[in-house]
Swiss-Prot record:
Subunit structure: Interacts with histones H3 and H4.
Family of this protein: Belongs to the RTT106 family.
Keyword Nucleus included in the entry's annotation: yes
Localization: Nucleus; Chromosome
Species: Aspergillus oryzae (strain ATCC 42149 / RIB 40)
Protein name in the entry: Histone chaperone rtt106
Cellular component, GO, one term: chromosome
Bias (Acidic residues) ranges: 371-383, 392-411, 418-432
InterPro entries: PH-like_dom_sf, RTT106/SPT16-like_middle_dom, RTT106/SSRP1_HistChap/FACT
Function, as annotated: Histones H3 and H4 chaperone involved in the nucleosome formation and heterochromatin silencing. Required for the deposition of H3K56ac-carrying H3-H4 complex onto newly-replicated DNA. Plays a role in the transcriptional regulation of the cell-cycle dependent histone genes by creating a repressive structure at the core histone gene promoter.
């Protein structure tokens, strides 16, 4: 013991060990403890220290990470860092954290996942990593290879006075639905926030500031850089043609909201209904339901003010399903949510296989705007309305071509069918109508009468009455005609008709017919 104490005091400060482990006091203490117990290994520890110093000099720009010890910090914090190191199992932490030329970096970015802190966002040029670097220690905290990114979302942050955007990076096996292969750790999603405005600290790899042009915002710059580096996906943003909330942003008046507030258990979050799937965020665990992973969607606990949304999800490589319930959704958003679900056929479990086979994806050659313009719902609805209007116009043209005012009365060659002409001819004896026509009253919105069977030569007056408030005119017209029939049963026949294929409550055609 005395010999060990003498040797320990003699080797308390070895220059090589002091230089090599100056930044690691706990590791340096363990080395000296080992030397005190086994002083014969002093030359070995000196050689290790010298080699470590040479590595530090060689990789001066890449900081050495602390060795994990029981005194370094809470176990939960270590797990967070380990899970966030990389999303791909093919890359080691050394690949992610190695010194590499940068294509883009942006300082003072507020990250929410997997760590809540301000970091520098980096995109490497050669290896293609998206990573976050500590601005004080210069250590890479976490990151992911761009080839392992499955979904990228850019979403407005709800309920903020200042407009901000959250970028959500969802790696493979990191969507909360699909589990990684056995023995591998599930990667965590990355979420960071940028303000709506010009970027203050965005630079290219050579240090040139980016976004100095007029109209360039931080959101535009980051989205552009991501799209340039992503090969399997593109940045997806909300689209009002997919879903927009019935309630505007509470903190930013006049701005549309694309989210729905909901609870998963006791955890509050927001649902976003996007062109590639449904996101629930922005707290852990973030969940993204891609269309191909949705088995079916249903409603439960539908009350006067709220409802619950149940999503049955099926992983891509498994037949086992899991059901997640999102509660306390405002009833005001039911119509928009239901239209979105029906548009993509998400309410029908029998279509799940077709969705998986089709694998909904706007991330090909088309941009998000182009993909939204090609969506079936709005375009199809517009074309149907145009088609109905065209058919009405065609039928009106046919009636005008067939109409011959002189065929009823050879003495009347004016060719007029106006109300004024009908008044002038009212005193004359009229020939009975020979068309074999069946006339009657059709209330607005009821089943169409066979308008084409009404002979145009018997029509005095034809007009169109829009739906809505004008339908009251149809009922008033009915009453007047019934009164006239009571006074003079031989005066007129009448009909309210709509063209076949015309949407009900859209157009009502009114005809006053000669007997």
């Amino acid at each position: 013991m005395a010999f060990a104490a003498i040797n320990l005091s003699a080797t308390k400060k070895i220059p090589a060990i002091e230089d090599a482990f100056a930044a690691e006091p706990s590791l340096k203490k363990r080395v000296y403890d080992a030397i005190g117990t086994t002083p014969q290994y002093i030359p070995l520890f000196e050689d290790i220290a010298k080699y470590t110093s040479s590595l530090l000099v060689r990789n001066a720009s890449a900081p050495v990470q602390p060795v994990e010890t029981p005194t370094d910090g809470p176990a939960a914090k270590k797990r967070k860092l380990q899970n966030g190191d990389t999303a791909g199992q093919a890359q080691s932490p050394g690949d992610l954290k190695a010194d590499a030329p940068l294509q883009f970096y942006m300082q003072d970015i507020s990250f929410a996942l997997p760590q809540r802190k301000k970091l520098t966002l980096e995109i490497t040029a050669g290896r293609g990593f998206l990573r976050a670097r500590n601005q004080t220690s210069k250590a890479v905290e976490f990151g992911i290879h761009v080839d392992k990114i499955q979904h990228v979302l850019c979403l407005p942050v709800p309920e903020k006075n200042q407009k901000q955007f959250n970028f959500c990076i969802i790696p493979q096996y990191g969507d909360g639905i699909n589990s990684p292969p056995e023995g591998e750790t599930a990667p965590e999603a990355m979420v960071w926030t940028v303000n709506d405005g010009p970027p203050r600290a965005a630079f290219s790899g050579n240090g040139q500031q980016m976004g100095s042009n007029d109209g360039q915002t931080a959101e535009n710059v980051v989205r552009q850089m991501l799209n340039e580096n992503l090969s399997q996906t593109k940045v997806v943003r909300p689209d009002e043609r997919e879903f927009v909330s019935a309630m505007p942003e509470a903190h930013r008046k006049g701005e549309k909201a694309y989210h729905v507030k909901a609870f998963r258990g006791s955890k509050e979050g927001y649902l976003f209904f996007l062109s590639t799937g449904i996101l629930f965020g922005f707290k852990k665990p973030l969940v993204f339901f891609a269309f191909e992973n949705i088995d079916s969607i249903s409603y439960t606990s539908v009350l006067q003010r709220t409802l619950n949304l149940n999503i049955v999800a099926r992983p891509t490589s498994s037949d086992e399903t899991q059901e997640l319930e999102f509660s306390m959704i405002d009833q005001a958003d039911f119509a928009g949510i239901d239209a979105y679900i029906k548009k993509h056929g998400l309410q029908d479990a029998s279509l799940a296989e077709a969705r998986r086979a089709k694998r909904y994806n706007i991330n090909g050659a088309k941009t998000g705007e182009e993909g939204a313009m090609d969506a079936d719902g709005p375009v199809e609805e517009e074309s149907e309305l145009q088609k109905a209007q065209r058919e009405l116009d065609d039928e009106e043209d046919e009636d005008e071509e067939d109409y011959d005012p002189g065929s009823d009365d050879s003495n009347d060659g004016s060719g007029s069918s106006s109300e004024e002409d009908s008044d002038e001819d009212g005193d004359e004896d009229e020939e009975p109508f020979q068309g074999g026509m069946v006339c009657g009253f059709q209330p607005p919105g009821s089943a169409p009468l066979p308008y084409k069977k009404i002979h145009a030569r018997a029509v005095w007056w034809v007009t169109y009455v829009s739906g809505g408030a004008f339908q009251c005119f149809g009922w008033l017209f009915n009453c007047i005609c019934r009164l006239l029939l009571c006074i003079s049963p031989s005066a007129i026949h009448y009909a309210l008709t709509v063209s076949p294929k015309t949407p009900r409550f859209v157009v009502t055609r009114i005809c006053i017919l000669r007997r």
